[in-house]
Amino acid sequence: MKLTHFPERIIWFQSLFIYPIYLSGTLFLFNLLQVWILAGYAIFWQIKLSVGPEDQINSTDIRHWRSIPPLIWAWLISMVGMGVTILIGLYENDYNSNEFIRSTISWLGDWSLLGIYPILGYLLPIRPAIIYRSACVIAAQSLIAMPICYGAYLMKLPGLIYLSPLERIIQNGKSYYLINWYSREVDSDGIRFVLFTPWGPALGLIGCIFFFYALEEKKLGWKWLGILGSLAMLVTSVSRGAYLFLPATIAIVWAIRNLSFIQLQLSLGTSFFLGGLGSTLLLDRFQEASGGVKSARKSSSQLRAKLEQAAFDRWTDSPFYGHGKQIPGPDFLKNMPIGSHHTWIGLLFTQGMIGFCLFFIPLVWSLIDLSLKAKSSPIAHITLKALLLITFASFSDNIEKLSYLYWSVFLLIGVTYRQPLHVEEEFLLGK
């Protein structure tokens, strides 16, 4: 594939060498540098366009910042506001300057990416095909990595290879710097792969996203390697959530694309009516299914429930700006941080109602707008699927911690708005 612009070369380099970068313990740092290199490139061109001749704007593929749509601005403003909210929460809870520095560094590596990448996707000439092919390349490499990781398990090698010394320098959490062959399941003592991600559910989420990317690949060979690799990532992650997210996303987006607004209303109305008639039976079946899923990893489900309850109970101590950061839990929570394992309850605990709204508003706005565009835009269609997956995952994980892995989704949000799309009024009119 011909790489026509510098930003595409940066993305392609990361996909080609993701496993060497991971094994060196620098994947988080590399992805952090990637966004700031691209941001610097975008700023350079914005200055050049501002001081250069008027016709230069039309002679380059770089978009001018004045044309950035409101939704893209909303992501940036909200994520900057998130950083300010974190600092206010730390100040109100009397944390020292070291915590201010650590939290600022953490913000630069998680929440800030959700605000920067949509703008980069809009301003810079990055083709979606590069993102799709890159996902297929990573998935193909993962097909090679999995037998090696399983061989390490058969040879009874320890799951942990080493902890990168970068953790002592950046200090934003050990999980980003643990280099693993595999990880152990708590309940069954079985194994699950994490590959280049920090934990199993993260691999499951990335596998789901890459699956949708692979379906868009034009070259048949890369397409099938991407599909097989992404599904293998999903299966070997042993993530209960990911097993449900994929079919749910397919069903929801199919309904959005293929049913008119009136048809959706009729379908939902009929479903609710029939559901009401058989509500007792349906509730019993749902509870049985839910209990089966939770019992598959009972101790994990119980721990998550306790963490969520503890975070929700403590939220009222600082309802508006939160506690500023996650705090270590007591022994009965196995010292897991309060505010972890659930994005929304975690937001209430760490950033309060202000932080909750700062993420909720641009996310819901994006989902609605992409749903309207998905009928007429293939890029909006794939972006909607990927963003829905992240939304589902937010109810079982702190998804901001994984933004350095799924950054391509937010890049695609910006790419979607580069093109002159028109919302199909027929959808709203039911035609």
Segments (PLM) and residue ranges:
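Membrane-interface helix-loop-helix junctions at transmembrane boundaries of multi-pass membrane enzymes
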Residues: K2-E8, W45-I72, A214-I227, N258-L266, ...
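N-terminal hydrophobic segments of proteins, predominantly signal-anchor/transmembrane helices
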Residues: T4-G25, I37-L120, L387-S394
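Loop-to-helix entry and N-terminal half of a specific, functionally important transmembrane alpha helix
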Residues: P7-P20, D369-D397, Y406-T416
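Transmembrane alpha-helices of multi-pass inner-membrane enzymes
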Residues: Q34-Q46, I382-T391, I399-K431
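A membrane-periplasm/extracellular boundary helix in multi-pass inner-membrane enzymes
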Residues: G83, L87, P147-K156, W254-S295, ...
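Alpha-helical transmembrane segments of multi-pass inner-membrane proteins
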Residues: Y132-G159, Q171-S237, Y243-I256
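Hydrophobic transmembrane alpha-helices and their immediate junctions
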Residues: L220-W222, P247, A251-A255, Q351-T391
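Long extracytoplasmic/lumenal interhelical loops at the membrane interface
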Residues: L282-Q351, L370-K375
